[in-house]
């Protein structure tokens, strides 16, 4: 009855959960996901990178690709298959509480750097022992919340939607 676990922190815990799943009547492996927005930072002993807004200041797509690739390798070593990153919301209000998770305010840069990170995580088809599934977040216009309040209403004109969020 359980199909996935979030934030499993050790390989031993992941192996135990997989063992339980494989001994169940359906024998379907469990999908394990973790929020690895700047490396697999929730897991002890893994590489922790600067927050995405800091990484974006490099303007170096290949650097974000390599971070995605290394993070995927460390995630798989601890039993995870799926990451809830990158955040490709376009930063529109610096008061927003998720600024650090974003890749900035420039749609071109966010698109390129987000794609590089996704490609690093998945390395083409995301099958294999050193690749993970990237879950891009959030919704279009997520960085447009009124007064910078997370999950608040957004007032987005068609022009802003087309020029900023759907270039």
Segments (PLM) and residue ranges:
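Glycoside hydrolase catalytic-domain context in secreted enzymes
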Residues: 1-167
């Amino acid at each position: 009855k359980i199909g996935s676990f979030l934030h499993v922190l050790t390989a031993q815990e992941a192996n135990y959960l997989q063992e339980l799943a494989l001994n169940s009547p359906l024998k379907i492996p469990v999908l394990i996901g973790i929020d690895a927005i700047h490396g697999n930072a929730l897991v002890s002993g893994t590489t922790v990178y600067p927050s995405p807004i800091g990484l974006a200041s490099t303007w170096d797509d290949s650097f974000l690709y390599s971070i995605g690739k290394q993070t995927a390798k460390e995630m798989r070593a601890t039993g995870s298959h799926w990451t809830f990153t990158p955040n490709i919301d376009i930063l529109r209000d610096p008061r927003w509480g998720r600024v650090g998770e974003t890749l900035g305010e420039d749609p071109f840069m966010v698109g390129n750097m987000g794609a590089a990170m996704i490609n690093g995580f998945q390395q083409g088809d995301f099958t294999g022992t050193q690749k993970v599934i990237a879950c891009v977040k959030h919704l279009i216009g997520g960085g447009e919340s009124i007064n910078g309040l997370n999950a608040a209403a957004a007032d987005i004109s068609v022009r802003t939607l087309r020029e900023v969020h759907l270039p």
